[in-house]
Amino acid sequence: MNYVDWCIEQHRKTNHYYDRYLPYEFHLRMVNNVCEDFQHLLDGEFEMKTGDKVSHPPFQITLRDACRRATWGHDLIEDTRVSYNDVKTELGEEAADIIYAVTNDKGKNRKERAGDKYYEGIRNTPGAVFVKLCDRIANVQYGKMTKSRMFEMYKKENPEFIRQLGYDMNEHNVYGDMFHYLNNLFRD
């Protein structure tokens, strides 16, 4: 079984749905589509751990490779019965580190689950900001399309969300195109 099928299967095994009725695979595909749209922002030539130019692609993982895998697995630790080590075995350490970073903390509400420590972990993990943005963009696109109440919640959260991810409109940011795209989704 390839890693995409493995990620989808973990959500199936826990009867995990998106918006209460869609197979969770729908959301994973949406997040991966956003990744594909913005993958040009990611390095695809150099190995993440060493910085060496990739000469053996299946054995050397670039930031682009790790993020692609992490978009498929971004909710595994949070929503299924798999551990960090399970994810590491199936998707590799680089993707597992990203997935771990975007996994919500324990908390009684959204604010507690996604506090300062959570966002610090995302900012300090290579690729995690990209994957978190892919997830948020997919959720906002879906919320806008379905006129979901979640769309208004994401709109309200957006200024703090982008601040916590380290975006400043007055400074260059490698993911600036993604932040602009996300902001534009909230325009009427």
Map each language-model feature to its residues.
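Active-site helical microenvironments for divalent-metal-assisted chemistry
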Residues: M1-D188
